[in-house]
């Protein structure tokens, strides 16, 4: 048997060539990109994610959700496939850092902008209060309710854990400002059952130099000093005391600003009755309100010329 030496063939393909080939077909991932990846390992500090890069990307536990996460198992499962946001460039080991929180954050702002456009009412639980107001979460975002927009007789600190209906006042992603109003939500709900020219019974809850604030079924309306009486009044204190029960007429409903304007002046049978004898005004309230509504109707029909 004859054996023949076969010369070794130089295939000319080195490790360097293989690395160059990988680089040639490697996708260049950039911070800000959204990619699809697969979870292949969960660790106490985060998770390793296969996104098709040469090195597994890392998802820190603090980037797993817009909400607080204690461990990766709360959010992810091995082999789960989902979207990830590339948070930073490769480190010295060639590893990218990913985020789910950033995706949820962007989508949350998109959602609250949509809700604001729809003038939607949302509900959220107060999780903390401070000197300025109360804090809530909307779609995972932290929102603030100024104290002036909290319509409740409870102390602010007693609101923690309570769910409130809310309207949007300001949605500004660039400044990270999400401001809401409890008062507007209540006023809107109340406004749907109120009409201009309607007489309502309320209680005086506050008195300022410019007028009195009247509680009418859980929402506050303003009885401006100019709408108390036809007679000149130096101060609302000369007519009202806090906790007085009063009859007032609604003269304006401003849903956009969440304001209810009230009047006793329009209910006076004779100018100055509210100063001299309020009981006469309250007794004749429905009769005077009917005249006021008729006047509004005639004005709308162009039958009355206003001065």
Swiss-Prot record:
Membrane-spanning ranges: none
GO cellular component terms, semicolon-separated: ribonucleoprotein complex; ribosome
Keyword line: Repeat, Ribonucleoprotein, Ribosomal protein, RNA-binding
Keyword Transmembrane attributed: no
PANTHER family: 30S RIBOSOMAL PROTEIN S1, SMALL RIBOSOMAL SUBUNIT PROTEIN BS1C
Annotated function: Binds mRNA.
UniProt protein name: Small ribosomal subunit protein bS1
Taxonomic source organism: Synechococcus sp. (strain ATCC 27144 / PCC 6301 / SAUG 1402/1) (Anacystis nidulans)
């Amino acid at each position: 048997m004859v054996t023949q030496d076969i010369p070794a063939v130089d295939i000319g393909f080195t490790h360097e060539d293989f690395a160059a080939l990988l680089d040639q077909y490697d996708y260049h991932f950039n911070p800000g990109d959204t990619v699809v990846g697969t979870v292949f390992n969960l660790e106490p500090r985060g998770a390793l994610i296969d996104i098709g890069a040469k090195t597994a990307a890392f998802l820190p536990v603090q980037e797993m959700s817009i909400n607080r996460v204690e461990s990766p198992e709360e959010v992810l499962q091995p082999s789960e496939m989902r979207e990830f946001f590339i948070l930073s460039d490769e480190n010295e080991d060639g590893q990218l850092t990913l985020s789910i929180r950033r995706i949820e954050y962007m989508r949350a702002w998109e959602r609250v902008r949509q809700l604001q456009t729809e003038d939607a009412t949302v509900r959220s639980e107060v999780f903390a209060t401070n000197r300025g107001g109360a804090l809530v979460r909307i779609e995972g975002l932290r929102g603030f309710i100024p104290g002036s927009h909290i319509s409740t007789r409870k102390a602010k600190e007693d609101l923690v854990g309570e769910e409130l209906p809310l309207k949007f006042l300001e949605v500004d992603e660039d400044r990270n400002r999400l401001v809401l109003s409890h008062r507007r939500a209540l006023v809107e709900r109340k406004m749907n059952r109120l009409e201009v020219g309607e007489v309502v019974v309320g209680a005086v809850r506050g008195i300022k130099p410019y007028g009195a604030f009247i509680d009418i079924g859980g929402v506050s309306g303003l009885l401006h000093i100019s709408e108390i009486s036809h007679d000149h009044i130096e101060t609302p204190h000369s007519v009202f005391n806090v906790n007085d029960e009063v009859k007032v007429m609604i003269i304006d409903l401003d849903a956009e600003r969440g304001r209810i304007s009230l009047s006793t002046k329009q209910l006076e049978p004779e100018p100055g009755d509210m100063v001299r004898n309020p009981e006469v005004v309250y007794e004749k309230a429905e009769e005077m309100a009917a005249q006021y509504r008729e006047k509004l109707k005639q004005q709308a029909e162009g039958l009355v010329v206003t001065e």
